Structure formats: C-alpha cells, structure tokens
From Swiss-Prot:
It catalyses: IMP + NAD(+) + H2O = XMP + NADH + H(+). This is Inosine-5'-monophosphate dehydrogenase 1. It comes from Arabidopsis thaliana. Signal peptide: none annotated. The lineage of its organism: Eukaryota, Viridiplantae, Streptophyta, Embryophyta, Tracheophyta. K(+) binds at G317, G319, C322, E489, G490, G491. It is found in: Cytoplasm.
Length: 503
C-alpha cells in the first residue's frame, strides 16, 4: 500500500457495519484536468429514458403535478406525477404537463368559485386571482378572474361575497391562444391584447394561464439545456402507481395519455405484490419502462431485478417528512443504501434513483458518485412556484404546505396503498405534515444547483457520472467517515450571525 494513499475505498468504508447518511461521509479531492463546463451530467432514469440532468421530482401530492413535471422536463430532468387522486385526475395532470410547451407556473393565485378574498395575500406578487372549478389548474376550464385594482375598489360588504359573484368572465376567445405558440409570439400577443394575461388552450381545454409579469420573470432565469422530449415531440412525464388490481386500470389510462415511465410506489418494494405487478407491466406494455422500489438492500434489489425492472428506487425513512425508521424500526442510512444497491444494480446495468435525504448540492454529488444515476427530490422542490398548492404567510414568511405520503392526512386521501394498508383497518402514520419556505421557481433553482454539482465533480476529478462511478469502483476515489466535530467544522460556524445564500 502506498504511503501517499489517504482515506478508504468505498467497499471498505461501507463494510464496517455502520449505517451512514450523506453527512456522515466525505469524499477526498482528486486531480483536475478539465473545466467545470466540460462536466456532463447526462444520465438515465431507467433503461430507455435518457436525461440531460440527474434530477427527478418525487411523486408526492405537494410536489409533482403538471407544472412541476413540465418544468423538470424542460430542464432536462423528469417529473413523476403522484397518484394520490382519481384515475381521471392523474391522467389529466399528465396530459396537461405534456401540453405545457412553456412551463411557466404563474405567480397569480388560483381559487375555487366559493372562495372569499379577505386580504391582498390572495394575490401574492401578481395582479390577478384566477377562478377555477376546483381551485387548481388541473381541470379543463378557467371560469374568470379578479384584478388587484378591482378588489381594492370594493367596499367591505362586497368583499364578503363569493369570488364567483364579482369575477370577470374568461369566456371570450380574445383571451385564448393555442398551446404550442412560440415564446416570442406569446410575448407579442400579451403586449398586443393589452389584457395582462392570456389563456393557453388545447382542444378546447385550458392548459395554462400566463401573465405579463410571468413572462418578464421567466426571461430572467438561466437558459436551460436540452429538454427531455419523447418520440411524440412532447415532454416526457413519469407517473406513480400502486400494486393493487385497480392500478392495472389506472395504468391503462396513463398509457393512453402517453406516460413515458411508471414508478411502482411502495415504501417497501420487496413484496409479492410488486413482483407480480412488475411482471404484469412488462408483459402487457413491453415498451414501457417500469421502476421498482423502494429498496435499501442488495437482496431486495436482486429480487426486483430478476422480476424485470428497468430501474430501481432507493430509500427507506430518509426523507425529511418520513418517520418510517422511527415508527417501524426498519430502513437504512441513505449513503449506505445507495452504495449497496448500486453495487448490485450496476452488474445488470440497471439505473438507480437515490430517493430521499437530499438537502443541498453536496448531497446530490455524494448520491451520484456513490453509484446513483439520478436523485429524487421532495422537500428540495417543495415550496417552489411549480409545486402544487397556494402560498400562505406565517410570521412574515411565504410558505407552502409539504406533507409526507405516509402522513395520516395524505393516507386518508388514498396514499395508504403505498404502505400496503387497507382502508378498512387502522392507519399508522409514517410521515408528517409541515411547511417549507418559498424557493422561487425550479427553472432558477435547478440550473444553479446543477452548476454547484458540476463543481463538486470537478473537485473529484470526474467529468461525468460514468467517470465518477469508474473512479469509485477502481478505488481511486477515497472516502472518510466524519466525526460530529468534523461535520460542525464543515458547516458555517463561529459567527454571531450570518446570511446564507446559495445563489
């Protein structure tokens, strides 16, 4: 052994019987002979779904719906639409995501007809509140709108009325433009119509609403790379399904609207139910990639690989809103889980999604270098403009709800299937409901994050994911476990106060 060797190879570090998280380990720097711009983050979600960046949005009902899926695809990643809703609703979300050629999530509020506007907070930073049947943009018809100036002129008695009683109608075709309109033409139409917003329609259904302010905001975002586009020329979108008999009907509807990959969504994927569903999907839809999980051991992974999965999802109890390890006493530290599962998956060429535990760009670097092909993000993307739900204000902070799919609130709505639950029996929570701060748009957040990831790869001497995996397997990349003091030293410390900005 050379006296110049530092640290440990990964196989030795992860064989010591400890369950490591991302913060527990640190990579040692290697040799740099290329620029940051030379780093390629291109990868695969599954066997036949290529991505330009290794980013996947989690199938959670407070993270991934149409705007998130379209935005992730436009950046070169992909979104996985949750299934905590009816079959028709999930299919509608996928259809809308594929129709969002311009993935612009408006800053304007969207309310249901019976809503009462009690303060200007309902408008957020926008001049509009739009009225839609369910209070979201996932159903096909916009009913009307209210402007901030209009509401300010109303007296107190009028403000107690339902929004439907005083909104302005959007029925006029003057507001509508085709969904496939070019961005430059869209900007011109907004200026020409002098109405402040336009409604994008496809086959008579509302796809999106875009305001002048939205256009100006998006123009200030970093330019994105090649998007994730499918053979049909539209954004590639993934979807989560369960393993029950009813999910076979759900899958049929999703295939009909063009879903590009399906994730079998289970907190413990090594089950007879998932093995049977994998075989059903591969037999019925052989051209559709199916991703199995969640798993954290090589044994679990091997079972799903032998059943025919095209990708694996790794993580159990590592998410910020997940309490599985606490409640059920099962799981694994995410760094250890990713390394172990990737070791067996690499032998079969199966891409691995590292799901959970991602709080910063450093965690993404660690997950990818340890063998993952992509990272799945929940809390990292929750609170963004594209995440479902409206903003609220708490102690002067702009926040959005974020809940675990194992929380009682989500399980009551239907996600108990993910935890192999039965709606007629007791429900045991494996997650919590919380809130996260406003993060702005993922169209800005992700490009800056990916640049930070590239810098991490450069420091490690890896110009691509494939290069990083090769350096790790050949024991050239070295790691060390971090003591508690080392973790403190590696963060901001010794200051009375500070302001931390990522970009």
């Amino acid at each position: 052994m050379s006296t110049l060797e530092d640290g440990f190879p990964a196989d030795k570090l992860f064989a010591q019987g400890y369950s490591y998280t991302y913060d527990d380990v640190i990579f040692l720097p290697h040799f740099i002979d290329f620029s940051t711009d030379a780093v390629s983050l291109s990868t695969r979600l599954s066997r036949r779904v290529p991505l330009s960046i290794p980013c996947v949005s989690s199938p959670m009902d407070t993270v991934s719906e149409s705007h998130m899926a379209a935005a992730m695809a436009s950046l070169g990643g992909i979104g996985i639409v949750h299934y905590n809703c009816g079959i028709a609703a999930q299919a509608s979300i996928i259809r809308q995501a594929k129709s969002l050629k311009h993935p612009i999530a408006s800053d304007a509020g969207v309310k249901f007809p019976e809503y009462e506007i009690t303060s200007l907070d309902a408008f957020g930073p926008s001049s509009f509140v739009f009225v839609e049947q369910t209070g979201t943009m996932t159903t096909p018809k916009l009913l009307g709108y209210v402007t901030k100036s209009q509401w300010k002129r109303m007296n107190y008695e009028q403000r107690e009325m339902k929004i439907y009683d005083y909104m302005k109608s959007c029925d006029s075709s003057d507001y509508c433009v085709p969904w496939e309109i070019d961005f430059e033409k869209l900007e011109f139409v907004l200026e020409d119509k002098q109405k402040g917003f336009v409604v994008l329609e496809r086959d008579g259904e509302t796809v999106n609403v875009v305001t002048k302010d939205d256009i100006q905001r998006v123009k200030g975002y970093p330019k994105s790379g090649p998007g994730t586009v499918g053979p049909d020329g539209e954004w590639m979108v993934g979807a989560a399904i369960g393993t029950r008999e009813s999910d076979k009907e759900r899958l049929e509807h999703l295939v009909n609207v063009g879903v590009n990959a399906v994730v079998l969504d289970s907190s413990q994927g090594n089950s007879i139910y998932q093995l049977e569903m994998i075989k059903y999907v591969k037999k019925t839809y052989p051209e559709l990639d199916v991703i199995g999980g969640n798993v954290v051991t090589m044994y679990q992974a091997q079972n799903l690989i032998q059943a025919g999965v095209d990708g694996l999802r790794v993580g159990m109890g590592s998410g910020s809103i997940c309490t599985t390890q606490e409640v059920c006493a099962v799981g694994r530290g995410q760094a250890t889980a990713v390394y172990k599962v990737c070791s067996i998956a690499a032998q079969s060429g199966i891409p691995v999604i590292a799901d959970g535990g991602i709080s910063n760009s450093g965690h993404i670097v660690k997950a990818l270098v340890l063998g993952a092909s992509t990272v799945m993000m929940g809390s990292f993307l929750a609170g963004s403009t594209e995440a479902p739900g409206g903003y609220e204000y708490t102690n002067g902070k702009r926040i959005k709800k974020y809940r675990g799919m194992g929380s009682l609130e989500a399980m009551t709505k239907g996600s108990d299937q993910r935890y192999l639950g039965d709606q007629t029996k007791l429900k045991i929570a494996q997650g919590v409901v919380g809130a996260v701060a406003d993060k702005g748009s993922v169209l800005k957040l992700i490009p800056y994050t990916m640049h930070a990831v590239k810098q991490g790869f450069q420091d490690l001497g890896a110009s691509s994911l494939q290069s990083a995996h090769g350096l790790l397997r050949s024991n050239i990349l070295r790691l060390e476990a971090r003591t508690g003091a080392a973790q403190v030293e590696g963060g901001v410390h010794g200051l009375v106060s500070y302001e931390k900005k990522s970009f």
